[in-house]
Amino acid sequence: MRIAVIGAMEEEVRILRDKLEQAETETVAGCEFTKGQLAGHEVILLKSGIGKVNAAMSTTILLERYKPEKVINTGSAGGFHHSLNVGDVVISTEVRHHDVDVTAFNYEYGQVPGMPPGFKADEALVALAEKCMQAEENIQVVKGMIATGDSFMSDPNRVAAIRDKFENLYAVEMEAAAVAQVCHQYEVPFVIIRALSDIAGKESNVSFDQFLDQAALHSTNFIVKVLEELK
């Protein structure tokens, strides 16, 4: 099976890249694509760059050029739910934009005109990801909504405003909704799997720098387990 794995930053893709066999890397429009073999699958690992425009552009190139059967977006995120701690893992049930507001024209907050309010992750991939983490004892794994915007959420006032908009939000980051929207339009199944590097609004910038490598390791180990179980 041909599986695409997307991470925004070098820290988020480096460990998985080192695990690929017969790896070949090429750069297209500033985006790094590495093809290789892992767990019996052909894996295309994309380093997309940070933010929604980079994520949308690179995911479009990915789907047009490499035609993966499934897409997994991984990396770090900021925790939003009160039950979460740094290092925990969130599996997306749906993904929304948290910085889109066209409510003046009767759209839901976060809804892009012409698109659904949220982008539903593939149920089979969500179930498989959840199954892969059942044996984990030291990492809390939850599933729920992930929201995306082109801002790092370190301002407590902005965090509070987004919490008011999305009651059941578990994590925020800067690429997933763009990846999900492109996958939705191409009808390619996707899931977002993010490990928490910080808790939004609580000295997030300090925590992010300190725990990014830990989050990257957790998310990469999780991705490998999913690939090993994926049939």
Swiss-Prot record:
One of its GO terms (biological process) is nucleoside catabolic process. This is 5'-methylthioadenosine/S-adenosylhomocysteine nucleosidase. InterPro entries: MTA_SAH_Nsdase, Nucleoside_phosphorylase_d, Nucleoside_phosphorylase_sf. Substrate binds at residues 78, 153, 174-175. Disulfide bonds: none annotated. The active site is at 12 (proton acceptor), 198 (proton donor). Catalyzes the irreversible cleavage of the glycosidic bond in both 5'-methylthioadenosine (MTA) and S-adenosylhomocysteine (SAH/AdoHcy) to adenine and the corresponding thioribose, 5'-methylthioribose and S-ribosylhomocysteine, respectively. Also cleaves 5'-deoxyadenosine, a toxic by-product of radical S-adenosylmethionine (SAM) enzymes, into 5-deoxyribose and adenine. Keywords: Amino-acid biosynthesis, Hydrolase, Methionine biosynthesis. Its EC number is 3.2.2.9. The keyword Repressor does not apply. It catalyses: S-adenosyl-L-homocysteine + H2O = S-(5-deoxy-D-ribos-5-yl)-L-homocysteine + adenine; S-methyl-5'-thioadenosine + H2O = 5-(methylsulfanyl)-D-ribose + adenine; 5'-deoxyadenosine + H2O = 5-deoxy-D-ribose + adenine. Belongs to the PNP/UDP phosphorylase family. MtnN subfamily. It is an enzyme of class 3 (hydrolase). GO terms for cellular component: cytosol. GO terms for molecular function: adenosylhomocysteine nucleosidase activity; methylthioadenosine nucleosidase activity. It comes from the Bacteria. The keyword Amino-acid biosynthesis applies. Pathway: Amino-acid biosynthesis; L-methionine biosynthesis via salvage pathway; S-methyl-5-thio-alpha-D-ribose 1-phosphate from S-methyl-5'-thioadenosine (hydrolase route): step 1/2. It holds the Pfam family PNP_UDP_1.
